[in-house]
């Protein structure tokens, strides 16, 4: 049975590995963003530095799931900007492998942002992933329950998360945990990788 605990900076590599493995619609992501190290530096480390209620699920000493959260956007944005300034020169010099696929992904993030819910009502957001081998055993539910409890204790009024209509298992979990779809729209973000656009959704949960 997996045990949920607070995430620490020492968990960076384990979280980055799992996050990178599942970034492509819950499946392996190296063809989308080849460097696991760069992924961790840009999309995991800022949460461990400036996020809130970060959690991991461990089973026999191995991280099998995580939630990375933020209670507000500004501290996270500053932490991300700092990491990006560090990473860009190294990326262009080829330190993380061929620059083009990484730059392509980053530019598409800027060009095709997903729908958002109002930040005054839903200031917090989260990212969650569970190792495919550990799915179906309540790991995601345990992580989300602990995360929502942490947000309530901090007085956060609401939380939002992003997913796609294609991520059926995750959508079922979110619905079971009291989330609902707030907004959705077709997005071409994944089209170069899948050959078609996907419906991007923002889900919300009120905590008051």
Feature map (PLM): residue ranges:
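A short beta-loop-alpha structural element at the N-terminal edge
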Residues: 3-17, 28
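Conserved GNAT-fold acetyl-CoA-binding loop/helix
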Residues: 23-42, 79-88, 97
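Active-site rim helix/loop that mediates acceptor-substrate recognition in acyltransferases
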Residues: 32-54, 111
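Conserved beta-strand in the GNAT
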Residues: 62-71
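Conserved acyl-donor/pantetheine-binding loop and adjacent beta-alpha core of acyl/acetyltransferases
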Residues: 73-127
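Conserved catalytic-core motifs of GNAT/GCN5-like acyltransferases
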Residues: 74, 80, 162, 175, ...
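Conserved GNAT acetyl-CoA-binding A-motif
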Residues: 122-124, 151-163
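Conserved acetyl-CoA-binding loop-helix of GNAT-fold acetyltransferases
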Residues: 136-150, 172-176
């Amino acid at each position: 049975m997996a045990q949920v605990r607070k995430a620490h900076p020492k968990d960076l590599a384990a979280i980055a590995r799992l996050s990178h493995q599942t970034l492509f619609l819950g499946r392996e992501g190296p063809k989308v963003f080849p460097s696991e190290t760069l992924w961790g530096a840009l999309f995991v480390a800022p949460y461990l530095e400036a996020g809130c209620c970060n959690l991991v699920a461990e089973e026999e000493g191995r991280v099998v799931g995580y939630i990375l959260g933020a209670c507000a956007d500004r501290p996270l944005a500053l932490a991300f900007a700092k990491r990006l300034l560090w990473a860009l020169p190294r990326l262009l010099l080829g330190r993380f492998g061929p620059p083009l696929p990484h730059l392509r992904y980053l530019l598409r993030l800027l060009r095709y942002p997903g729908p958002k819910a109002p930040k005054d009502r839903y200031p917090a957001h989260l990212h969650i992933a569970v190792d495919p081998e550990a799915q179906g055993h309540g790991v995601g539910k345990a992580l989300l329950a602990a995360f929502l409890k942490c947000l309530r204790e901090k007085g956060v009024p609401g939380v939002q998360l992003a997913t796609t209509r294609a991520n059926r298992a995750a959508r079922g979990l979110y619905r079971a945990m009291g989330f609902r779809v707030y907004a959705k729209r077709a997005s071409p973000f994944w089209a170069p990788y899948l050959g078609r656009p996907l419906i991007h959704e923002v889900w919300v949960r009120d905590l008051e």
